[in-house]
Amino acid sequence: ITIVLGFFIARTITKPISDMRNQTLEMSKGNYTQRVKIYGNDEIGELALSFNNLSKRVQEAQANTESEKRRLDSVITHMSDGVLATDRRGRVRIINEMALKMLGLECADVEAKHILDILNIDDDYSLDDLQENNDSFIIDINSEEGIIARVNFSTIIQDTGFINGYIAVLHDVTEQHILENERREFVANVSHELRTPLTSMRSYIEALEEGAWRDPEVAPTFLNVTREETDRMIRLVNDLLQLSKMDSSSDQMNSELINFNMFINKIINRHEMSQGKNVTFIRDIPVKGLFVEIDPDKMTQVFDNVITNAIKYSQESHKRVEFHVKQNTLYNRMTIQIKDNGIGIPVNKVDKIFDRFYRVDKARARKMGGTGLGLAITKEIVEAHKGRIWASSKEGQGTSIYITLPCEVMEDEFGDWDA
């Protein structure tokens, strides 16, 4: 009897302890859902109850941790900045999609690789440098795509002072970098374009002050050059003001529906009359009316710019300007081609002619009185009309300027418009 009673008494003690041991093993595997059976209200029962409460709290804490982790993963995934997290040795453990996109890499390319190697800054920095330097810096992280990023590093440090890892945040500043370069280049160009005529005018005025005004042959020439340079500065300032208005969207568009055939023919007629027999104008324009919604004044400026350039750069012996207008009925758009028979443009410079202040031949352009802004303004106006402008050229074979605009063919109940 004593042995039997001893067995049952021992079992009432060992069974709950065995259950708690099994539950501890389950918890070590990450399973917090099971509970220990409570056999009584004695000390072992209270221990089992406390164990269950502990298990419940750990389960809740684990659930909160998982929830926070998912939330953090979601934030990192959808961030507009790139994020890389490393271990204490600098090996990448976490990288979001934006960082991969900015770096032009796949996940497999960065797995367990050193962050300094991935960012290609291992020659300039060490982990100790990043630890000591809290300032951000600019790096070219993807040369092929031309992506420039501002990188901010932070060190993950435990309460004990032990370094646990590093975090790098990549902010794409490519557009700001390009805009800043364009701004500097623009200011430099404006300064140069204003300084050149001012220097020339100053020289002539000083010569006149020193007595050149008494020379009946020299004085008129000096005054004429001064007037021409003044006119060029006025044109430059006016062009700059127009570009400024377009950039700030304060330039009002007064659009109206017009017959484009009549519109373009009127412009060509004006240039034909002013040029006389010096220039041959060839027209390939449909008779049926093509209607466009445009600002007539601004689009007149566009075609005047393009036609004037075509005349300027055509062959001196026999200037010829061709006009070809074609409609794409599928997309309700038309293409205007204005072609000259001039000196042409090198292939590597064709795409740059619409840049502000760009000139293929600077000396010749200045001699002809150009500001270097005409085609830039032309492009802004065309794009404001939901159109597109581009050029095609070969050296010695002339240049073609193409302009596409939205259009419609409207049936006129009174008959076709006479172009």
From Swiss-Prot:
Record-annotated Histidine kinase domain positions: 189-409
Protein name (database record): Sensor protein kinase WalK
Biological function: Member of the two-component regulatory system WalK/WalR. WalK functions as a sensor protein kinase which is autophosphorylated at a histidine residue and transfers its phosphate group to WalR.
Ranges in coiled-coil conformation: none
GO biological process: cellular response to phosphate starvation
Domain PAC residue range list: 132-185
Domain named PAS: residues: 68-138
Modification note: Autophosphorylated.
SUPFAM superfamilies, sorted: ATPase domain of HSP90 chaperone/DNA topoisomerase II/histidine kinase (SSF55874), HAMP domain-like (SSF158472), Homodimeric domain of signal transducing histidine kinase (SSF47384), PYP-like sensor domain (PAS domain) (SSF55785)
PANTHER family in UniProt: PHOSPHATE REGULON SENSOR PROTEIN PHOR
Reaction equations catalysed: ATP + protein L-histidine = ADP + protein N-phospho-L-histidine
Residues recorded with modification Phosphohistidine: 192
Keyword entries, A-Z: ATP-binding, Cell membrane, Kinase, Membrane, Nucleotide-binding, Phosphoprotein, Transferase, Transmembrane, Two-component regulatory system
EC top class, as a word: transferase
Database matches in SMART domains: HAMP, HATPase_c, HisKA, PAS
Gene3D superfamilies: 1.10.287.130, HAMP domain in histidine kinase, Histidine kinase-like ATPase, C-terminal domain, PAS domain
Any GO molecular function: phosphoprotein phosphatase activity
UniProt lineage: Bacteria, Bacillati, Bacillota, Bacilli, Bacillales
